[in-house]
């Protein structure tokens, strides 16, 4: 979609007012176009989500997805559409869906990622390798929930903060920090990990 000149001028004025910096015509045109493209993607996603929500009214237990691949809201793996399930808790792979159905993991983990850790997050947030975490599990210091795969092996490991009260800290909060050259980087707060302090 070609932006009218009036819209580009308006964007330049808004940007200068908000950030105190003038944009060239080309910078303003590109930034405004990027904003419109983003809005189109968001609207398209919202329309798809509303259609899914309406379909749930006739299929309240959920349904398989079409038009994938999709990312599972629990394990975050990319899954082909025939191996996904959508219900009131969101899009899940069939392994995670079965784990929710069998109450191996609570349904709230689908939408509230701040209430649990996956194995990779220990390394990401605390620089603790999975071997150390599994040692804590064997020693009974950490409780782990397992999402099994179809053959009974391990598909995903979850560590609920609720199951490990007083042992697992809340998830570190993030913030954008300015760096050189008008750029920003994402930083996480430092949160102590109690099992390493004993």
Give short role names for the model-derived ranges.
Residues 110-136:
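Polyanion-binding surface elements
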Residues 66-67, 87-88, 114:
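Flanking scaffold residues of small Cys/His-coordinated metal-binding clusters
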Residues 77-81, 100:
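Cys/His-rich microdomains that often coordinate metals
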Residues 72-75, 93-96:
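Short cysteine-rich clusters marking metal-coordination/redox-active sites
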Residues 82-91:
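Short linker/helix segments within small regulatory modules
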Residues 168-198:
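C-terminal, charged low-complexity interaction regions
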Residues 94-102, 143-177:
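Short helix-start
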Residues 47-48, 97-114:
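Short metal-binding segments enriched for Cys and/or His
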């Amino acid at each position: 979609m070609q932006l009218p000149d009036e819209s580009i001028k308006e964007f330049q004025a808004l940007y200068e007012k908000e950030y105190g910096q003038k944009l060239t015509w080309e910078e303003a045109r590109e930034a405004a176009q990027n904003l419109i493209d983003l809005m189109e993607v968001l609207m398209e996603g919202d329309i798809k989500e509303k259609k899914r929500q309406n379909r749930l009214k006739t299929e309240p237990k959920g349904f398989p997805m079409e038009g994938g691949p999709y990312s599972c809201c629990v394990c975050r793996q990319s899954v082909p559409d025939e191996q996904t399930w959508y219900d009131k808790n969101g899009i899940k792979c069939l392994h995670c869906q079965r784990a929710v159905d069998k109450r191996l993991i609570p349904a709230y983990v689908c939408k509230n990622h701040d209430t649990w850790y996956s194995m990779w997050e220990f390394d990401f947030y605390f620089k603790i390798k999975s071997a150390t975490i599994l040692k804590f599990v064997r020693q009974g210091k950490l409780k782990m929930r397992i999402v099994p795969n179809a053959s009974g092996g391990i598909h995903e490991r979850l560590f609920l903060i609720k199951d490990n009260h007083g042992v697992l800290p809340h998830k570190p909060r993030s913030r954008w920090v300015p760096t050189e050259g008008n750029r920003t980087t994402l930083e996480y707060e430092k949160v102590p990990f109690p099992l390493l302090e004993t």
